[in-house]
Amino acid sequence: RVAVRRKFDASRAPSDAISRRAPRRRVGPSRARATTREMFLPIDYARALTPEAIEFVADGAADSLAFQRLRALNAARASCAHAAAHADADVGRRKYERYVDVITEAEGALEALDRGEGPTARWASTLESGREARSYPAPGLAGERAFALFGLASCHRRLCARETAARMAEGGLGDAGAASCSKNARVAAGMFKHLQETVLPPLKASLDGECVANELTASMAEVMTLISLGDAQGAACRRALERGSAANLRARLHRGASELYRDANAVLQSRRCDWNGVDIFLTAGVLVAWKTHEAEAFLAHAEARRAADECGEVIAACRRAEEAVRDCAQASGEIVSWATYHGELASRVAALAAKAVKENEVVFFQKIPSPGAPLPEAAVVVGPIEYVPSEPSKHTFFQG
């Protein structure tokens, strides 16, 4: 499902023209719910974040107790290695959940690992530019715990992404689907926020400035928090459309989602020196989500103005929507589902714009304002679900 990669800079808006092909049937306020079959589908950007197996120089019964415990820890972390590719996303979540508990309780039992003695635990990072994942060492147990928690949060994002795609393939999210997708995204946001504010800042001093995984930077955790909240807000936008909510409410919801992704993009652009490059899917995905939600907001705003017979404002809002669609035309080509949604959105915008222009030429004769009335105030209806570390039960291989 992945298109061919190309060099892409999210800081520059592409100038691709959108299609203005006339639709086969009327697309307006009364038909929006019936004809809108697509939405921005979130993806798990850390789709392959995995722990690498710890290699031991020799096997033998004479290993110290610490190394026996390290082997037991390695067995627990190895179960996470194939979580990203597992057919059942919930299985991967349970594996990471188990490992987060295990690594938390291991503190104090594996002092050698914290002192940098013995084998090094490494992780394959997938949030960098380039085709191959780069391997990074975990700086002690605290770093290992941070990697594991990032992986667990990514599992919740994977659950959100897979359920969203599955339900949309069946025709829509529905109440239960919207609630479930939103909850997983909000749980992920809470974990990323916990990493950003609590786990990662104390690690900064112990990290090698030229050899730091993107997953161990507070700025990347902030980006992922905002993206996850944007995905949760996107589920609310879709459900509002399915329910036939008023155009003004849909405009406010889409504006809220757009601003969350806009803020994520701002962090990506301003904190570039924190990272060893950023994967193109991440930069492109944030731009596509930001601009398509902005276009949806202006389109809903245009529908509301059309209902009030403000044809000039309708045309102005459609022009703003067209600008937003153009801004992400190139980026949308990175994923097939994004390109499909982008084309469908462009068609809806062009159809309403053509309808409004014709009505204005024949009936209303209104002046077209520039830039037109502003969008209604954003309505952000989601927030992160606070992550509270659990008290792990004591396992026998860390006893004695």
What is each of the regions a protein language model found here?
Residues N214-C273, G277-V278:
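Alpha-helical scaffold segments of alpha-solenoid architecture
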Residues T36-A138, E215, E242-L249, Q269-G400:
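Eukaryotic intrinsically disordered, low-complexity segments enriched for acidic and Ser/Thr/Pro residues
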Residues A148, A153, C160, A185-F192, ...:
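Structural signal for hydrophobic/aromatic residues that build the beta-strand cores
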Residues L127-E132, P137-A138, R157-L195, L200-A213, ...:
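Short coil/linker segments at helix-helix boundaries
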Residues E144, G151, R158, A221, ...:
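"A position-specific structural signal for the A-helix of alpha-solenoid helical repeats
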